[in-house]
Amino acid sequence: MKIGKFVIDGNAAIMGILNVTPDSFSDGGSYTTVQKVLQQVDQLIAGGAKIIDVGGESTRPGYQFVSAADEIERVVPMIKAIKAKYDVLISIDTYKTETARAALEAGADILNDVRAGLYDGEMLALAAEYDVPIILMHNQKEEVYQDVTQDVCDFLSARAQAAIDAGVPKDNIWIDPGFGFPKSVQHNMELLKGLDHVCQLGYPVLFGISRKGVVDALLGGNTKAKERDGATAALSAYALGKGCQLVRVHDVKANQEIVAVLSQLM
């Protein structure tokens, strides 16, 4: 498979989550030193991750805003350290253009924007300037939908076209339906059932549902984040069967065999 100019073996791949934040819902505070980050990256790569997604601000419900300066201070040293030791693709999980530019200069390869370029109006131009892949995620302020699947498809189509209009080659555009941003459990369930429609929009799709609240709901509620990895792996298999090509997860090893097998059947 290809993500922009980068070629990855197989027809599907795993993006390993690396939160260098104090307050992420699943692993906040776990990876705040270079040593701990490199130990975790060792595990992610050994487990089969082809992309490391580095984030410096939590996007969990009720998250605390982080300035671009603080975000840069968190992510840039980690990106440099990872690139110095490993030959692995790095995506920067940010919606701030200032942070994204600093991350690209530090060695990041891919932009992963949970605001789809809408936060400061400059992210799409940055992707075009650096000729890097960008992942555009569905996100909106309120849980109000006429038809959640159709609304998500319309949003992603419009944002992808905006990226093209800004000079981003179509081959550099990936989309993400944005499970949990902001969607009720019912909205997430409907979107899961309609995932094939997202995959038919003409852009490769990232599937990111790892350890989220909808997974807890599917398990009956009251589970801890790390207790959701088995269900996350099952949903990864479902998503790959629907046509997604990239799964973003915390526990890479639990998903690796699923991706390895299903990518040969896609």
Curated annotation (Swiss-Prot):
It is an enzyme of class 2 (transferase). Pathway: Cofactor biosynthesis; tetrahydrofolate biosynthesis; 7,8-dihydrofolate from 2-amino-4-hydroxy-6-hydroxymethyl-7,8-dihydropteridine diphosphate and 4-aminobenzoate: step 1/2. The keyword Metal-binding applies. Its cofactor is Mg(2+). Coiled coil: none annotated. Its EC number is 2.5.1.15. Residues 12-260 form the Pterin-binding domain. Mg(2+) binds at N19. It catalyses: (7,8-dihydropterin-6-yl)methyl diphosphate + 4-aminobenzoate = 7,8-dihydropteroate + diphosphate. InterPro entries: DHP_synth-like, DHP_synth_dom, Dihydropteroate_synth-like_sf, Pterin-binding_dom. Gene3D superfamilies: Dihydropteroate synthase-like (3.20.20.20). GO terms for molecular function: dihydropteroate synthase activity; metal ion binding. GO terms for cellular component: cytosol. CDD domains: DHPS. Keywords: Folate biosynthesis, Magnesium, Metal-binding, Transferase. The keyword Transport does not apply. One of its GO terms (biological process) is tetrahydrofolate biosynthetic process. (7,8-dihydropterin-6-yl)methyl diphosphate binds at T59, D93, N112, D176, K212, R248, V249, H250. Belongs to the DHPS family. Catalyzes the condensation of para-aminobenzoate (pABA) with 6-hydroxymethyl-7,8-dihydropterin diphosphate (DHPt-PP) to form 7,8-dihydropteroate (H2Pte), the immediate precursor of folate derivatives. Homodimer or homotrimer. This is Dihydropteroate synthase. It comes from Streptococcus pyogenes.
